[in-house]
Amino acid sequence: SSSPMTLSELDLDTIASKGITPERLQQQLDRLATGFPYLELSGSATVGHGIIALSAEEQCQAIDRWQQYLADGGEACKFVPASGAASRMFKSLFSFLDGADDVPAPGSDVAAVIDNITRFAFFPALDDITRTVYNKSVEQLVEDHRFKDIIAAIITEKGLNYGNLPKGMLQFHSYPEDGCSRTPVEEQIAEGTATAVRPSGTLHLHFTVSPAHRALFEAKLAEAIPAAEARAGVKIEASLS
């Protein structure tokens, strides 16, 4: 149990205004000190067990209702929560970079990254970075067993800096036929042009972002929106909060 609280009259008035008793507040503080139990999962969600699947006819009906809503002047805005940082995705890569071992353990996340390095959408950008920073291609670094240099080029500031970027800024999907890749932000824009364009021909997008990353999103949107407008033949208006 955490040490007993000392509450002022103002504290007591404040918690009382929120419907919280001193005893309840102490219980909450104790919980923060002792931690929370893990949830017990009863199984995976599947169709018929937590997931509802629409039939082909129901899908068509839903699409028709949506299209009719838009045709009748209904307002649509694609809302995208985009404040998530990518740092947790790269936890095992940071651990390897900071660790004593220079070779990733067989079967580890880092080994899987190295084994599949050419399959990532960001591989061309990574290869450019390693040629600039190390004067070697990624594949040459693999041959030289310079695995930490490769990982550093992915997650640190001297490379792609993915360990410090929001998830929305990572090159995520590859489009070989177009010779490009898309970030999640660009995919959200593309999805919006297919699903949420108003009869006026305008797509409204709203992204919630971390204040620390706002400038990054503004720059990406300024770059991505004109290309998406030309591709889809629509006007795109985006806002951030």
What are these regions (language model features)?
Residues 4-47:
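N-terminal regions that are enriched for targeting/export leaders
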Residues 15, 37, 41-89, 94-241:
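Domain-scale recognition of functional cores that engage charged ligands
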